[in-house]
Structures are given as C-alpha cells and as structure tokens.
C-alpha cells in the first residue's frame, strides 16, 4: 500500500479515488492535486512510479489534512463556545447548530429520547 500524508491508500483503486481516503481531500481537491502533479486520474495506485508518488506527496503536503484539519475544526468549535456565541451555546447543549427545528426531530444531536412522566389527572 502507498502511504501518503500518514494514510495507507488502497492500491487497487484509481489514484483520484484513493486520494479521497485522506481526511480533508475530496473529489475536487484530488483532481487538482493530480493536475498539479502531472499524473493521470485513470492510473491505478499500484502502477505509479516513485517520481509520480513523490510529486503527489509534495502536492498533498501543501494542503491542511488529517490531524491538523481535525485539530483546527475542534479549536474553531471551542472558540465559538468560549466567546458564548449562539452557535457555541448550541454546541455546548448538544443541539442542532444551523437553525433546524427541535420540536419533533433532531434525534441525532439530542441522543436517545428521555422518558417524560405525564401530568397526573385530578380525580373526579
């Protein structure tokens, strides 16, 4: 397996698909990396020579990927929580951040439903 940016990418797949196994590289970025490295998108990873592999590694090194990108995202969320913005408060409470309704759904963010005891009816 070829190792790029600390990730073992699959050798049987095309290079443009294999690069997407790296966190922070999607389809468009993978295409740009290959274009800048002068490597065809259709070639398989196992067919790459050392020069092509090092060119791809050089291009990927210019992009924020993997641990650095995860750390940056986490720090951005922490900053929002520290300054007390609306988005930060929603993150802190574990509720949807982007304005979705929470009356009926939002189970992914809120977790399992909590049992709520009903109000007792007064006897007649």
Swiss-Prot record:
What processes does the entry annotate via GO biological process terms?
translation
Name residues in a coiled coil. none
Molecular function (GO) terms for this protein are: rRNA binding; structural constituent of ribosome; tRNA binding
Lineage top rank: taxon: Bacteria
Q: Which InterPro entries match?
A: Rbsml_uS13_C (IPR027437), Ribosomal_uS13 (IPR001892), Ribosomal_uS13-like_H2TH (IPR010979), Ribosomal_uS13_bac-type (IPR019980), Ribosomal_uS13_CS (IPR018269)
Could you confirm whether the keyword ATP-binding appears in this record? no
User: Which controlled-vocabulary keywords does the entry list?
Assistant: Ribonucleoprotein, Ribosomal protein, RNA-binding, rRNA-binding, tRNA-binding
Instruction: Report the PANTHER family cross-referenced here.
Output: 30S RIBOSOMAL PROTEIN S13/40S RIBOSOMAL PROTEIN S18 (PTHR10871), SMALL RIBOSOMAL SUBUNIT PROTEIN US13M (PTHR10871:SF1)
Family to which the UniProt record says this protein belongs: Belongs to the universal ribosomal protein uS13 family.
Please state what the protein is called.
Answer: Small ribosomal subunit protein uS13
């Amino acid at each position: 397996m070829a190792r790029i940016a600390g990730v073992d990418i699959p050798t049987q797949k095309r290079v443009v698909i294999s690069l997407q196994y790296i966190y922070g590289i999607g389809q468009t970025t993978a295409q740009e990396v290959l274009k800048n490295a002068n490597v065809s998108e259709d070639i398989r990873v196992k067919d790459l020579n050392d020069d092509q592999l090092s060119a791809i590694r050089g291009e990927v090194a210019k992009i924020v990927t993997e641990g650095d990108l995860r750390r940056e995202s986490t720090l951005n969320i922490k900053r929002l929580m520290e300054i007390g913005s609306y988005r930060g408060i929603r993150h802190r409470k574990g509720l949807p951040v982007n304005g979705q309704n929470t009356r009926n759904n939002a189970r992914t963010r809120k977790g399992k439903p909590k049992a709520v005891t009903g109000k007792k009816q007064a006897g007649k």
